[in-house]
From Swiss-Prot:
HAMAP family: RuvC (MF_00034). This is Crossover junction endodeoxyribonuclease RuvC. InterPro entries: RNaseH-like_sf, RNaseH_sf, X-over_junc_endoDNase_RuvC. The active site is at D11, E70, D142.
Amino acid sequence: MAASVTVIGIDPGSQCTGWGIVREASGVLTLVNCGAIRPKGADFAARLGDLYRQLADVVRAHTPDEAAVEDVHAAQNVATALKLGQARGVVVAACAAHGVPVIDYRPSVIKKALVGTGRAEKEQVGYMVGQVLGVRPDWKLDTGDALAAAICHLNQRRLTRLAGLA
């Protein structure tokens, strides 16, 4: 078993992608860094390219061991769902290109792991992330969701180890 593991949690979006790096060492979770990417570009393809470049920079800077990525959930309409899916694909590609394994989590699973209900609001998730990491949440809601994904994954890893499945 590794002495520590670093996970990047990512909440993909075509307009704002939240990311958060959490490290677990000896059962203690620590916030390493977090932020939000608001891709720029003249058109959607250019924004996806910018999202890739910015996220790749984050991955290179922090060298996470694994990535926990929020899966696509129900969107307002088909066009929104397609754009979200494309942004998520860019996120997965940026991680994979840097050798970071990607684990997918449904939003309801992440929310339930942090708040106790799969229908929690973003504000509730952000509050619980702050409680778990011992910090005051002053980040964007998408960043809180990304940190929640990382925490959810680290908890899942711990449970898998305890159950003797890993």
